[in-house]
Amino acid sequence: ADPDQLATDIPDLDMVDPDEPASAELIEMARACEDAARSIEGITNSDGAEASWGHSSVTLAATNGFAGHYARTDCGVGVSVIAGEGTDMEGEYDFAHAVYRADLEDAGAVGIRAGERAVARLGARRMSTSQIPVVFDPRVAGGLLGHLSGAIAGPSITRGTSFLKDSMGKQIFAPGIRIIDDPHRPRGQRSKPFDAEGVANKKRALIEDGHLTTWLLDLSSARQLDLETTGHA
């Protein structure tokens, strides 16, 4: 990377929670999550619940003179349960994660949602083929954004394997849709102050009014495309 591409003003993204929970607290969170899920009528068994807390750190030093460090914590809770009996049984799960434990969704609410999801799957029937409006569950919507980021990643574009390789500037979402990538969001679960090559990253629009506006480039893919890296190594 050129010196002017490197991150020099590394922001504090408030990603370390000093309040580390004791093991007994995590056990109680998992128990509360499972109890809430099993309280839903129709739930017949549990595949288990879990609660976790972790601390990780990243230090990057490169021959180009870059040196940077950041750390993060993560607290999570989740449960998997089974609804129904005999040949009519369905399983579902739910979970929540946050950088700060204080921001984590209530364990009981996570459990209730998992139980309700499992019960809602009972008696499902196949639909006939048709064209109808679709409302995506938030969990599915997140997956769609994952497919988008993979399709506009530099390596996929340079190899020509992306279904969006010829879509720069074209409308690929409905008008009015704007999708933002913000690596500097305080307490963001995927926030980071620089990328894996020490390049400065920043908030940018991926989709504006339904139109694709950028690729997600590291140094190698940027060179191959004769473009500037976007700090997505």
Where are these regions (language model features)?
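Active-site bordering "gate/hinge" segments
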Residues: 1-202, 208-211
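C-terminal, non-catalytic macromolecule-binding modules
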Residues: 211-233
